[in-house]
Amino acid sequence: MTPLIAVLFAILQGATELFPVSSLGHVVIVPALLHWPIDQASPSFLPFVVMLHVGTATALLLYFWREWWAMLAGLLGRGEPGEVDAQRGLLLRLVVATLPAVLIGFALKKPIQHLFASPEIAAAFLIANGAVLIIGERLRRRRAGNGFGIGQLTLRDSLVIGLFQCLAFLPGLSRSGSAIVGGLTRGLDHEAAARFAFLMATPVIAGAAVIEVPHLLHHAAAARGMFGTALLAAVVAGVVAYLSTAFLMRYFRNHDRWALGPFAAYCALFGALSLILIPFGA
């Protein structure tokens, strides 16, 4: 993989990881359409992907550092009693929401792994992702009121959102999009749903990197050969992820009616075009 392709791949991953358009779907489809010289079976590819995850998780941690710092302070019992309880409650909700991804991820990783290499399957699921986003908006409109904040989530709500997030184990279904839709169905407004989804993403993305550490050590020699390129890509992915998060939080703050609509239309259009073009690019 050349440095240019590595940077382009990092930009693609860093942006689509947070936008509700499926990073996994894009990193399968786009290289196939553009004939990027990427060998996903290469021993050096896994370390490269792990570094991208590290960059993205770091960006999320930096953007939401105040929230994580407040939760840490609450866990340690520092602050006013009411604030301590609120922060401990938020941390517990995030733990509950993350558990389904951990448990289901281990169970489904091998059975569905063969789907990850198919651009056609990813494109079909990308169209399905657009449908999921539209369904989420319709369900949101049926709920009374304007939506509430994270502090009003119950543990059951958190578990449901975590289960929605697990849809993203299928390539083409967005992790952030599924989690946001889960939040909307439980009554959150768009900004609160996005904030909770992005807070959930930090341990999930970091965990995805940690899980691959044994394989990373196994291919340590190959990793050393492209460490500089992988480090550059991690920085690029982190910067793009940070900017994407800032944009999306501002977007959802200012749009609480059909905010997922443009992303749904994009997914349907790009998925359909990909299904048409991929056979000609093979």
Swiss-Prot record:
GO CC annotations, alphabetized: plasma membrane
InterPro entries in the record: UppP (IPR003824)
Taxonomic classification: Bacteria, Pseudomonadati, Pseudomonadota, Alphaproteobacteria, Acetobacterales
Keyword annotations from UniProtKB, A to Z: Antibiotic resistance, Cell inner membrane, Cell membrane, Cell shape, Cell wall biogenesis/degradation, Hydrolase, Membrane, Peptidoglycan synthesis, Transmembrane, Transmembrane helix
Main subcellular localisation: membrane
Membrane topology: Multi-pass membrane protein
Gene label: uppP
Gene Ontology biological-process entries: cell wall organization; peptidoglycan biosynthetic process; regulation of cell shape; response to antibiotic
Task of the protein: Catalyzes the dephosphorylation of undecaprenyl diphosphate (UPP). Confers resistance to bacitracin.
Subcellular location(s) of the protein: Cell inner membrane
Enzyme Commission number(s): 3.6.1.27
Annotated source species: Acidiphilium cryptum (strain JF-5)
Domain of life: Bacteria
Record-annotated membrane-spanning stretches: 7-29, 45-65, 89-109, 115-135, 153-173, 196-216, 229-249, 258-278
Protein name according to UniProt: Undecaprenyl-diphosphatase
Additional comment: Bacitracin is thought to be involved in the inhibition of peptidoglycan synthesis by sequestering undecaprenyl diphosphate, thereby reducing the pool of lipid carrier available.
Entry's family note: Belongs to the UppP family.
Pfam families: BacA
Molecular-function GO terms, alphabetical: undecaprenyl-diphosphatase activity
Recorded catalytic activity of this chain's protein: di-trans,octa-cis-undecaprenyl diphosphate + H2O = di-trans,octa-cis-undecaprenyl phosphate + phosphate + H(+)
